[in-house]
Structure formats: C-alpha cells, structure tokens
C-alpha cells in the first residue's frame, strides 16, 4: 500500500511522519514576532535558524491574522514579502508556504517560487482558480463555521472544499486541512476540536494543527 503524500510543487512530503512548520511573520503587528523580521536579511536568517531547529517547511505571511486584526491591501501585503520570498525559496531548500487570502498576492507568490498557498478564508473560487493553474500545495483552513457539533461542522467544511478543489482540477494529494483553532470559534469549541481532532481529518489528505 502506497504512503499518501502532500504534494507541493516539486516537493513530495510522505504523510507517515509529522512535519514542523516554521512561522515567519513579515509584519509589524503579529502577536508572536511582529516587527522582528521586516528586514529581508533578518527574515532569511530566522528561516535558516528554524530549518536548523528542525522545521520541514516555512510559512511566511505579510498580514497579521491575529484576533481583531485590520486587513491591509493586497499591494501592501505583497510589498512586505516580495523581497524575502525569492531568498527563502533559493536559500532554505524547504517548501515555502505563503499565508494570504488575496488571489492577486497568491499568483505573485507562486511566480516567485512559493510551493504552498495557505488561505485562512478556506479557498474561495478565485483562490482555487489561482491554485489550479499551478502545482502548488493548498492549506485550507476552516475560518469558523456555525451551528451544531464543532467537529462535524469542520469536517463538513473540509469535505465541501475537497469537492470544490477536485472540481477545479486540484488533486487530493495537494490538499492540507487546518481546523482553524482560535478562528471564529468559542473557547469550548476550540477545546473540543483539540480533544477530538481525529474526527475532522479527511482520508488521504495532509492535516495541519497550530501549536
């Protein structure tokens, strides 16, 4: 029996092991490291540190999505990441994920060498179209569904997005699902998700969990 993989551009990540995703916020206002890595040199140095510490892939974002954030424009988001992205691709040797919900930014990120798109809004039609025109991996986050059992809701959202992705021509092995702990959910729902996360997983697809 073949081991399922997460296919992200030229990278094929077997799903019989766990990978650590290093988070690189090229923003002034992220809750964890806002302002530290606005300089491309500092950002690259941090990415290489995370690789040395065991990261198997790097996620870079130019827009904070902390609770209560104020969205910036696609142009400003791209301005923040455009100089560091090619260096990350060239120097780390790791799959580089770009955290964006803007299709315009996503297209430019792929052209700059990103292997993965990470959309906290769950890949609407325009983002699916961008992804379908490439071989990138797609991290699909549940942005906060409503009504009923939280695990069933999240899994239902994932299955809906799986169907939409496949209709767009995106193969199952290119999909990774993130239950979005802390996004659009109550404290009780977040705890329930963490305790019963196996109920939300989609067979044959990668799964991402924030820590």
Short names for language-model regions:
Residues 24, 50, 54, 99, ...:
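Conserved, mostly hydrophobic/aromatic
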Residues 26-45, 70, 95-97, 147-153:
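Active-site mouth loops of central-metabolism enzymes
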Residues 70-98, 103-107, 131-141, 156, ...:
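Alpha-helix-loop-beta-strand connector modules within alpha/beta enzyme cores
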Residues 30-32, 56-83, 181, 185-187:
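Glycine-rich, proline-tolerant flexible connector loops at the mouths of alpha/beta enzymes
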Residues 51-52, 110-111, 126-135, 169:
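Acidic (Asp/Glu)-rich catalytic clusters
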Residues 16-20, 55-56, 90-95, 113-115, ...:
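Short, well-ordered coil/turn segments that N-cap beta-strands
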Residues 1-27, 170:
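N-terminal amphipathic alpha-helix/helix-capping segment at the start of soluble metabolic enzymes
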Residues 35-41, 118-124, 147-157, 181-199:
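Active-site glycine- and acidic-residue-rich loops that bind
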């Amino acid at each position: 029996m073949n081991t399922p993989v997460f296919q992200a551009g030229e990278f094929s990540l077997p799903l019989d092991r766990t990978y650590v995703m290093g988070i690189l916020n090229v923003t002034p206002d992220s809750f964890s490291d806002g302002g530290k890595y606005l300089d491309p040199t500092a950002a690259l140095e941090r990415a290489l540190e995370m690789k040395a510490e065991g990261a198997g892939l790097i996620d870079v974002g130019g827009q904070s999505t902390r609770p209560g954030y104020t969205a910036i424009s696609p142009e400003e988001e791209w301005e923040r990441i455009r100089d560091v992205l090619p260096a990350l691709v060239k120097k780390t040797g790791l799959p580089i994920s770009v955290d964006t919900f803007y299709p315009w930014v996503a297209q430019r990120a792929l052209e700059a060498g990103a292997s993965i798109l990470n959309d906290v809004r769950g890949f609407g039609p325009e983002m699916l179209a961008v992804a379908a025109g490439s071989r990138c991996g797609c991290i699909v986050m549940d942005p906060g569904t409503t009504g009923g059992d939280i695990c069933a809701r999240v899994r239902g959202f994932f299955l809906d997005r799986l169907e939409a992705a496949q209709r767009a021509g995106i193969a199952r092995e290119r999909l990774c699902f993130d239950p979005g702990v802390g996004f659009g959910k109550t404290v009780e729902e977040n705890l329930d998700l963490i305790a019963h996360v196996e109920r939300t997983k989609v067979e044959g697809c990668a799964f991402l969990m924030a820590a």
